[in-house]
Amino acid sequence: MPFLPFSYYPFSLEVILMEYPKIVVKPPGPRAKELIEREKKVLSTGIGVKLFPLVPKRGFGPFIEDVDGNVFIDFLAGAAAASTGYAHPKLVKAVKEQVELIQHSMIGYTHSERAIRVAEKLVEISPIENSKVIFGLSGSDAVDMAIKVSKFSTRRPWILAFIGAYHGQTLGATSVASFQVSQKRGYSPLMPNVFWIPYPNPFRNIWGINGYEEPDELINRVLDYLEYYVFSHVVPPDEVAALFAEPIQGDAGIVVPPENFFKELKKLLEEYGILLVMDEVQTGIGRTGKWFASEWFNVKPDMIIFGKGVASGMGLSGVIGRKEIMDITSGSALLTPAANPVISAAAEATLEIIEEENLLKNALEVGEFIMGRLKEIKERFEIIGDVRGKGLMIGVEIVKENGRPDPEMTGKICWRAFELGLILPSYGMFGNVIRITPPLVLTKEVAEKALEIIERAIKDTLTGKVERKVVTWH
């Protein structure tokens, strides 16, 4: 079995026969160091949290080559966005051909056949029946748009969300998020009328319930909190427009709720006419082995927010929602570059690649393989408290002897993996979860190599061989 899908074989023989991973100079190398210093002089620190001192030069499939010639296996996928990997021939061809025809037309003022086809496909694969689409540029502005739709369609002022939620960096998205206080410090006043409730984390929740053994008990605690505390004492339910949720919390640490949670939550929300908005920017477009992670929980949201992987990371997002709520004021969802012909070409190619190459099935099979191997590794190392996920969205929680989060150990494991040629980030509300979100084209052969690196990184960290650690959201 090759390390790349057969569709990648227009690549040169050099790439096909490439050794992976390949570390020719200890990262960061001299060229990377030089560029990082130049960046510090001209780019604001606000643009991101630099998880790794990595400067990519090119990519192919699930691999990234940096400016110093090091080749890494990528378990980050540009924040779970590079769904079809890097430089997929079909994607490259579609984008090149479209640029040669016309690179920009604005769907806010004219019409676009490409954008229409992408919207038709999204409506087809969405679990929401009779839906329409609004296009955006990033997950953050798509969250803002979903807030606007929620308030416009219900004429209600309040938004509910979950503790641990990451929804983006625009003002509205920051306002509904509850991931790290560092992302809100200094920006008040944010959008008013937002309230948060606990997310049903089976492994680590405020009630101390083992949600794997007692899922119904955990579900009931959250729903009781919402109905008998929030709706009775904090926010009038008839003034709540929507509840925003990630079907699987991503940046909070790949937190998978009990299977029946969202189905029961939707029943409660419907009693009060409250919309359920699923933020699937990270979980959607095949990441979990289904087009949308909402499908795992047998729930039909009123809106789904998408982004990241829909155009393989090339800057498309949006909202899919029930027709009766999506027709808002003309022009109020207008963004100049949204779904322009080039981005739409990338999205159309991405959706076709996922279908034609059975990447939903691949995400399930390779994800199950990784989960199985990680659970075997867990049996050998007490520092692994939990392994969880769906498809190619997997979290490994690192803990101390007393079960408390161990971000220090997590950061060192991820740094050692980076030195060995694996891009492996640490995330989580406490910075102690290894996040695995590789491109959907990942094969079992490459995954096995990555797992060998993870196990070695754990051993090297436990024996005191690792001094540095990766940066995380803290």
From Swiss-Prot:
EC number: 5.1.1.-, 5.1.1.1
Temperature dependence: Highly stable at high temperatures.
Pfam families the UniProt entry points to: Aminotran_3
Transmembrane annotation, as ranges: none
UniProt cofactor(s): pyridoxal 5'-phosphate
Sequence positions that bind pyridoxal 5'-phosphate: 139-140, 282, 336
Keyword Isomerase (UniProt): yes
PANTHER family per UniProt: AMINOTRANSFERASE CLASS III, LEUCINE_METHIONINE RACEMASE
Name listed for the protein in its UniProt record: Alanine/serine racemase
Organism this protein belongs to: Pyrococcus horikoshii (strain ATCC 700860 / DSM 12428 / JCM 9974 / NBRC 100139 / OT-3)
